[in-house]
Amino acid sequence: MINISFPDGSVKQFEKNITAFEIAVVISTSLAKAAMIAEINGDLKDLSTQIDNDCRLRILTAKDPECLEVIRHDAAHLTAEAVKELFPETQVTIGPAIENGYYYDFARDKPFTTDDLAVIEAKMHELAKKNEKVTRELWDREKAVEFFKSIGEHYKAEIIASIPSNEPISLYRQGNFIDLCRGPHAPSTGFVKHFKLMKVAGAYWRGDSRNEVLQRIYGTAWATKEQLESYLFMLEEAEKRDHRKLGKELDLFHFQEEAQGMVFWHDKGWSVYNTIEQYIRRKIRKNGYIEVKTPVLVDKSLWELSGHWEKFRDDMFALETDDKTLALKPMNCPCHVQIFKQGIKSYRDLPLRMSEFGLCHRNEASGALHGLMRVRSLVQDDAHIFCAEEQITDETVSFCKLLTEVYKDFGFTDIKVKFSDRPEVRAGSSETWDKAENALKEAVEKAGYSYTLNPGEGAFYGPKLEFVLTDAIGRQWQCGTLQMDFVLPERLDASYVAASGEKKRPVMLHRAILGSLERFIGILIEEYAGRFPLWLAPVQVAIATITSDLNDYALEVQKALIESGVRVDINISPDKINYKIREFSNQKVPMIAVIGKQEKENKQVTIRRLGTTEQEVLSIEQLIEYIREENSKYI
């Protein structure tokens, strides 16, 4: 007999070699009917897995989050089965689950069309309704290679031949379809109910541009109909909010082939950029930071000392001049250490909080570039805090509070924290890591945050915190970071004189709140759907006249607003007032100042706010004072 421990703490005895599914039947027939996979000692397994030793067991259903990836993997196999039935000449390759869905790569001479996707999806529903049994089989390697070659699946044969000889060849069969896979999978195709094929794209075999191009079908799959509909609605909303689309419509920025990954900021976009920089500058000054500016182009010798040349050389832009190799900096930290090293530093100088809006360059692959979200030239709201070990907790708490304030001002209140602790390969002693991790954990808790642990995901030089924002349509964006570093001060010989008179290495805290300004602006455009709040809007007030005889007064209002620092646009053309209002509304201007005969006589304007039909009559002075008050909260 073997002892099986269950999540409720109970322990029951069963005969050896019983399957997880058979145990589910013993527990209840309803559980057995809903069961998808089993978790045995923390590992996900098929329900058909035989258990011959004592273990911890969970029977998982579609309600358990662990099953979502299984559903998506099952959907990938279902897609491949449908394609093979409809287009038997097609070869299958790989089909993993990914975030929010899955994909499957196919080799086929004729490209899949939108109509093909609809037919494939219909076939998938047909196969799912058949509720075909899914079974796992272990094959001999040579037999598996020969089998897949014999049915014309040369890509599968190549994959199997490349699997290490000590690994079993695991195949899954459903209906007439068989695929190479580690699993686990649900016991039948009927568990895949809520899915949709999304698009077709090209993909290189094995991700190598020297290889042939395959056709990648992307799909999404969910546990419930409501989840699928919610996701599709989010995608629809995201398309409307796409920062690339809105950037063009609102005349904020553009990209072009001659400068891939580099932003051409237009006047309005540059206004948003500068306002954010001004806002951050005000915040960091209030929090005791100094601001510096370091070179963009630095000799490779510094990058060799810091270790960046070895690790990031392929992502750096370099050039040869005067028998030297110079590189555009991909990050600011080594340069900040150079400033710290100027002059003798004492413990009284710590903590030293050094910030920079640092212009960095990274040689991203052209295929990875994505509007403002992934660029080659970027500015970070970067800072490095040089401190003593005993100051780590307080500095981290202060940073968390500052970060919370900033995110709140931009409208983000749902913030999640990920804590990445020591990796297997790391610098520094276990004692040093213990201190660092405990200091970060204590600080995060003091700042009022809970966190999820990313075991082993810290950098080799120290643990880190990642701050993740949730936007208006439920997407998550990792923006802020705090990274502890024991190594760089050592490598670049940074030191301070302790109270005892001995020379010590400072701890270096790398921290950013927004990350790259370019990416954060992209996030904001999508968060606000282009409707920037008044303090941030590139045009705060648009002036529109009802008739041309009011133009002189409109220009007078414009002059007064500009002199008061208000960002203004004006339309004194002969166009009708409704057209002017509509045009300014399409440009997402938060306040439209309408000027008619009565407004001119009373030295007033009638304010219409974006998205409402309400109107408010204000004097010029009242309007200026209102905008000043709004601005003063942020900049």
UniProtKB/Swiss-Prot annotation:
Signal sequence coordinates: none
Domain TGS: 1-61
Enzyme Commission number(s) of this protein: 6.1.1.3
Protein localization: Cytoplasm
This protein's record includes keyword Glycoprotein: no
Cofactor note: Binds 1 zinc ion per subunit.
Subunit structure: Homodimer.
The protein, known as: Threonine--tRNA ligase
Organism: Rickettsia bellii (strain RML369-C)
GN (gene name): thrS
